[in-house]
């Protein structure tokens, strides 16, 4: 889910028992906030006196305000539809009732996906005061602008690519340390790193050829970094043409074998190798060592 906030005249659409409901209202709005709220579109209006003179002080305030306003509009229509269709045919899929929609206003934090929340926090730390403006195209699943970044920015590209977004979402609980090769800063998530690249208009020309890899968007500053990435992350995924275009010689990137004879694991990345040794073999309370101790005791 990718929220988007706009200072616009919004067209809020929802569905009730397969019937499309629509309300036009000059409000701040939040894109994709719930189960049945599919699309919001807007275009800036000059001289619209109904718009507030100033933005809320924080991003979460913006989202909460737009959520409450949008729910007020949609819930009214949903309540009318719910009253008129209280008896539905048997087997019809249950729909979200207006009171259930209204009750969701306090769940805003849980509705925002973790990667987007990381970016909100990153923007707040940087003292950002973003305005999120969406285009007037209604048939789209994501906003045209994410946190004030244009559509061609790294952040927007990450969120507009379903395969890349799926890869990021699958690994969102695993936080790493991403080093910027242009400065000394480090970042806990890929999205924060992408926001940093956008902040300084940094473009890295060497892109990963794997379709679902985030680094096809973020790229690398030098070809050696790309080759190292592909050798450690995508061995087995690269076809012959990709290896030729990368000038990749796999033998230059040998695997690291676990030093413990009883363990036969091999690692392509040095950090993964060190983490394995520290957590599995040098940790007396690891599951591996506990099982090994039990086996040795049984053989006595």
UniProtKB/Swiss-Prot annotation:
Chain ranges of zinc fingers (C2H2-type): 178-199, 206-234, 256-281
Record-linked Pfam families: zf-C2H2
Q: Which UniProt keywords apply?
A: Activator, Cell cycle, Cell division, DNA-binding, Meiosis, Metal-binding, Mitosis, Nucleus, Repeat, Repressor, Transcription, Transcription regulation, Zinc, Zinc-finger
GO BP annotations of the record are: cell division; G1/S transition of mitotic cell cycle; meiotic cell cycle; negative regulation of meiotic nuclear division; negative regulation of transcription by RNA polymerase II; positive regulation of invasive growth in response to glucose limitation; positive regulation of transcription by RNA polymerase II
Q: Does the keyword Plastid apply?
A: no
Q: Where in the cell is it found?
A: Nucleus
**GO terms under cellular component:** cytoplasm; nucleus
Record-linked Gene3D superfamilies? Classic Zinc Finger
Compositionally biased intervals (Polar residues): 80-90
Q: Name one GO molecular function term.
A: zinc ion binding
The main location class comes to nucleus
Does the keyword Nucleus feature in the UniProt annotation?
A: yes
Renumbered to this chain, region (Disordered) spans 80-100
User: What function does the entry list?
Assistant: Involved in the control of meiosis. Represses the transcription of the IME1 gene thereby inhibiting cells from entering meiosis. But also activates the CLN2 gene thus promoting mitosis.
Protein name in UniProt? Zinc finger protein RME1
Q: Which organism is it from?
A: Saccharomyces cerevisiae (strain ATCC 204508 / S288c)
Organism lineage string? Eukaryota, Fungi, Dikarya, Ascomycota, Saccharomycotina
């Amino acid at each position: 889910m990718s929220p988007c906030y706009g200072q616009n005249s919004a067209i809020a659409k929802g569905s009730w028992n397969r019937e499309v409901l629509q309300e036009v209202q000059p409000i701040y709005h939040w894109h994709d906030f719930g189960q049945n709220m599919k699309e919001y579109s807007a275009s800036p209006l000059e001289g619209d006196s109904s718009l507030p003179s100033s933005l809320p002080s924080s991003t979460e305030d913006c989202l909460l305000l737009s959520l409450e306003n949008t729910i007020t509009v949609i819930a009214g229509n949903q309540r009318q539809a719910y009253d008129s269709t209280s008896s539905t045919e048997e087997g019809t899929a249950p729909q979200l009732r207006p009171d259930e929609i209204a009750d969701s206003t306090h769940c805003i934090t849980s509705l925002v996906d973790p990667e987007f929340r990381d970016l909100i926090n990153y923007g707040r730390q940087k003292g950002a005061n973003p305005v999120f403006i969406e285009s007037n195209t209604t048939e789209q699943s994501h906003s045209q602008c994410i946190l004030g970044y244009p559509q061609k920015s790294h952040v927007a590209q990450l969120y507009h690519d379903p395969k890349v977004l799926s890869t990021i979402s699958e690994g969102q609980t695993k936080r790493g340390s991403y080093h910027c090769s242009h400065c000394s800063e480090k970042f806990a998530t890929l999205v924060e790193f992408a926001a940093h690249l956008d902040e300084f208009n940094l473009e890295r020309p060497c892109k990963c050829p794997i379709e679902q890899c985030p680094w096809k968007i973020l790229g690398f500053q030098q070809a050696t970094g790309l080759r190292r990435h592909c050798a450690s992350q995508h061995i087995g995924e690269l076809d012959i043409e990709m290896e030729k275009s990368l000038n990749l010689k796999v033998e230059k990137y040998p695997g690291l074998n676990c030093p413990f004879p009883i363990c036969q694991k091999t690692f392509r990345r040095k950090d993964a190798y060190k983490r394995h040794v520290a957590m599995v073999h040098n940790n007396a309370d690891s599951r591996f060592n506990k099982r090994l101790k039990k086996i040795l005791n049984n053989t006595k």
